[in-house]
Amino acid sequence: MGEPIKNRYEFVVLFDVENGNPNGDPDAGNMPRIDPESGLGLVTDVCLKRKIRNYVEMVKEDSKGYEIYIKEDVPLNRSDRKAYESIGIEETDDKKIKEAVKKLKKTDPDVDIKLRDYMCDNFYDIRTFGAVMTTFVKAALNCGQVRGPVQIGFARSIDPIISQEVTTVSYTHLRAHETLRHL
């Protein structure tokens, strides 16, 4: 898997978007995010991390140590199950998981740390960006917080952007098609 990142690095990434919307704002009808004072386009850190996650998932294709924890439209507890299985808990019901963890903690008080280590060893995005392991709290576990070495801020465009809506025309009936053709 390679050495973990040990030093701090600062870098700039330039990317080009032409006739597109790199990060629509759901609160504004999915229009591009724009700084109202400067007119510069914005791309959130969440969007940039999603692009990195998608790239790693595509390139590494489930290689050991490169799974993605925060996936689009996939509940986190699906990945949590893999962590539970790594410590010998096969249960799927939350109540039974909690009971199994309680029983396991009597013989292994470091179960919280083992789960956290499993998550870091297997999930690229947790190891890279960090995570707050709150999904394990319902099983009476305290896996804490992982601080990732890679921190990403908002991206800003170099030049102001102009947001334009593009309208399309479609017809649903043959009569409408004939009318449009003769205009």
Feature-to-residue mapping (PLM):
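An N-terminal structural lobe/cap that precedes and organizes the functional/catalytic core
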Residues: 2-82
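A generic structural micro-feature
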Residues: 5, 144, 174-175
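Residues at beta-strand starts and edge strands
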Residues: 7-11, 146-148, 181
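Generic structural motif
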Residues: 18-20, 155-157, 179
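Extended, compositionally biased
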Residues: 57-171
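Conserved small/polar residues in nucleotide/adenosyl-binding loops
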Residues: 172-182
